[in-house]
Amino acid sequence: MHRCTISHIDPDSPLRHAAHPGDRLVSINGNPITDVLDYKYYAYDPQLAVCLRRPDGSEHTVHIVKPLGGELGLDFETYLMDNAHSCANHCVFCFIDQMPPGMRPTLYFKDDDARLSFLMGNYMTLTNLSEREVQRIIDLHISPINVSVHATDPELRAFLLGNPRAGKTLE
């Protein structure tokens, strides 16, 4: 799977004649698309230059006009368009670690992903965020993000989350 690979085009999509399943979404109005947040943010405008890459590597740009906020009608191989960020903590209270064995595998995935927090309401601890990701959250106005704090004392927070970096996250 390649990042941002189109799996389906809605029949009413403004790209229905230009995009095909298997194409990759490269950029919108010159902004590289790396995941679902870029896609939703940059596709909001009514006038778009959409760059697509065919499976053979050739690229072409399609200029479209659509209603402000109107959907492009593209589905991708995965919802986030890349892998979810997994949790690096070892929390003493982790509910996933307390689940019984034998349940479906997706229930055991520990995410700590700002995108899933914003889009799905999941909680995150902020211990996974790089400075670049924090800046991106600010630049794209990604809000709200649900933060699981548990403690503000750095030493106690590091202990509870089982992660020495957790104490520095709230600085």
Where are these regions (language model features)?
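PDZ/PDZ-like groove recognition
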Residues: 1-10, 14-15
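Short, surface-exposed secondary-structure edge patches
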Residues: 12-18, 40-41
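Post-signal-peptide, soluble extracytosolic/periplasmic N-terminal scaffold domains
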Residues: 14, 21, 50-52
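Conserved PDZ fold ligand-binding element
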Residues: 16-34
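N-terminal functional module detector in eukaryotic proteins
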Residues: 34, 49-50, 90
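Short secondary-structure capping/turn segments at boundaries of alpha-helices and beta-strands
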Residues: 36-40, 134
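PDZ-domain C-terminal substructure recognizer with occasional recognition of PDZ-binding tails
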Residues: 40-76
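Conserved Radical SAM active-site core
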Residues: 59, 66-171
